[in-house]
Amino acid sequence: MKIKQILYCMLLACFILPASAQNSWGIVGGGLFSKSLSRDARFSLGGYAGGMYDVHVKNSWYVQPQLLFTYEEFRSKTRLGTDSFFSKFNLELPILASYNVALNNKWNLRINAGPYLSYAMFGRDKSIDYAYGNGMHSSLGWWHQDFPDHFTYGGRAGVSLESEHFIYTIDGKCSLRKRPFGQSGSLSAGVGYKF
């Protein structure tokens, strides 16, 4: 319950911040490689899309809350002959502190870091056991309300290049909460546009 209250407060802060000439809205999207940090896990493709609000704080400092819809996959293949697949569709709320470095009149480099909170809405799980008797055993299912706990939190850091209204980002994130498939990490690259 406490995590839901924190999430509501962070969302409310995104909408009631005062508008100024230095603040701007934007959209972002891109692809990502995600991986569970557990043994025998492999990288898998995913993606994200969403919105952001860039708040100028002081001099070169900014705060950048984002609201993203993400898709992540986690795969593993054990030496005992079991393939596992787990996917999730999330609503993610990163709150990034950002430092702006002007490279020239056209380009700026932004260094971003901060926490994120993620809510897993639904997904799929699949396992194939090749050591099941003389053949294989496969199971495939959807999960949503029966998933034990939907919230995950962690840290996110990266850099972005900005030119006028366009944004090009490279980010990495790592969950601090251990899930049934272990802690997770991802690397992402994306583009965005500020209005």
Predicted regions and their residues:
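Bacterial Sec-dependent N-terminal signal peptides
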Residues: M1-V28, V191-F195
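Generic short beta-strand segments
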Residues: G29-F33, F69-Y71, D171-C174
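Outer-membrane beta-barrel proteins
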Residues: S36-D40, F74-T78, A120-K126, R179-G182
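N-terminal, post-signal-peptide region of Sec/Tat-exported proteins
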Residues: L45-S76
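Outer-membrane beta-barrel transmembrane domain signature
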Residues: G47, V55-W61, D83-P180, L187, ...
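Alpha-helical transmembrane segments and their immediate interhelical/interface regions
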Residues: T70, F74-K88
